[in-house]
Curated annotation (Swiss-Prot):
SMART domains: PA2c (SM00085). Belongs to the phospholipase A2 family. Group II subfamily. D49 sub-subfamily. It comes from Bothrops ammodytoides. Signal peptide: none annotated. This is Acidic phospholipase A2. Disulfide bonds join C26-C115, C28-C44, C43-C95, C49-C122, C50-C88, C57-C81, C75-C86. Its cofactor is Ca(2+). Pfam families: Phospholip_A2_1 (PF00068). Its main location: secreted. GO terms for cellular component: extracellular region. Expressed by the venom gland. It is found in: Secreted. PROSITE patterns: PA2_ASP, PA2_HIS.
Length: 122
């Protein structure tokens, strides 16, 4: 669920997902096309691809189960589809933490007209 994704971003990356990643580059936020502009935008591209591979549940609307063990987020639950959503979100939040290029604010509120290149395959 997108609200859980926001929570994981805060837990793992230590930042608000909506504020820092909701309107960034060509892939962070709604939609996505063109080539990722930097490492942070690539995190969003990979997350979009991950959601695109989920079948049998809705990555944006379905809630999943996770826990924290020694400060590490662990995806759980019996539903493999929902666990896959959790893994997509966990990996993206970790990617945001490890690639803090969002400080390059030339990509904040980046115009979609600058994202016209052919998209890379997932």
């Amino acid at each position: 669920h997108l609200m859980q994704f926001e929570t994981l971003i805060k837990k793992i990356a230590g930042r608000s997902g909506v504020w820092f990643y909701g309107f960034y580059g060509c892939y962070c936020g709604s939609g996505g096309r063109g080539k990722p502009k930097d490492a942070t935008d690539r995190c969003c591209f990979v997350h979009d691809c991950c959601y695109g591979k989920v079948t049998g549940c809705d990555p944006k609307m379905d809630f999943y189960t996770y826990s924290e063990e020694n400060g590490v987020v662990v995806c759980g639950g019996d539903d493999p589809c929902k666990k896959q959503i959790c893994e997509c979100d966990r990996v993206a939040a970790t990617c945001f933490r490890d690639n803090k290029t969002y400080d390059n604010n030339k990509y904040w509120f980046y115009p979609a007209k600058n994202c016209q290149e052919e998209s890379e395959p997932c």
